Amino acid sequence: MAAGRLAGLPPGRAATLSAPAERHASVAPARERHAGVTLGAERERSLTGVDYAGAFLDENRAFAELFRDADESTPVPTCPDWTLRQLFRHVGPGDRWAAQIVRDRLDSYLDPRMVEGGKPPPDPADAISWLHGGAQRLVDAVELTGVQTPVWTFLGPRPANWWIRRRLHETAVHLADAAIALGREFTLRPELAADAITEWLERVAVQAGGQGAPLPLDNADTLHLHATDPGLGDAGEWTVTVEQGRIAWSHEHGKGSVALRGGATDLLLAILRRRPLADTGAELFGDDAVWQRWLDRTPL
């Protein structure tokens, strides 16, 4: 599971992205604020209309296809010290781990060494089938257990379907890692990339500042992300602030100490440090130091 550091910065000039005046008038007060909780993660479909189970199986297949003829010793620069072999062995067991948690309705941590069938077979073709089987096992487990059934997660109890969404975005980001390692193009459907950003912010809101680590933003700082893909609407805007000592965010347009504007896939790759901002099509407005500090103190 992706993990990393988490949190701050000096005042800078406000950055804002242009939007119609009527949009500003309809925003903030009624918007849902997300601070230290996972709101809406239990829905089977996201604000962008993503079918989590279908998208998860699609990304699993795409991930597998990159490995069919690849040299498994290829280094993965976005996952330091890993090769494609290690990346494959990270993603596959993770799906089966989640499936077992859901199937057994666990309310406590499952030791990964106890996962049934957690190691891929040596034959490459069989390993691909094993990878597909793990993803399907999770989808089936959620269906049998019930979407809303509470189970253990590393953020506390969540509905079983939370795990499909988590594994969907874990797989999508590691698909990007594999594509970058192999010099391939990578893109996600805008609605999927936007939901990945939302899911990541939901986790940051819960985990940021843990174990005494500084928050990614200072109290006076604000980060605004604006996805330019047509049709995303509110689902393509995120304003991140600090409220009562915690990271909070909402789907709204607003001013920020720093703002990023670009396609949802470019924004996702930038905030997860898969691509330097300069290598994406995204633009930065405002205080670059706020952005750099945010990157330094948030998880990969």
How does the language model describe each region?
Residues D71-D111, L155-Q211, L267:
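Short, contiguous alpha-helical
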Residues H253-L300:
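C-terminal interaction segments
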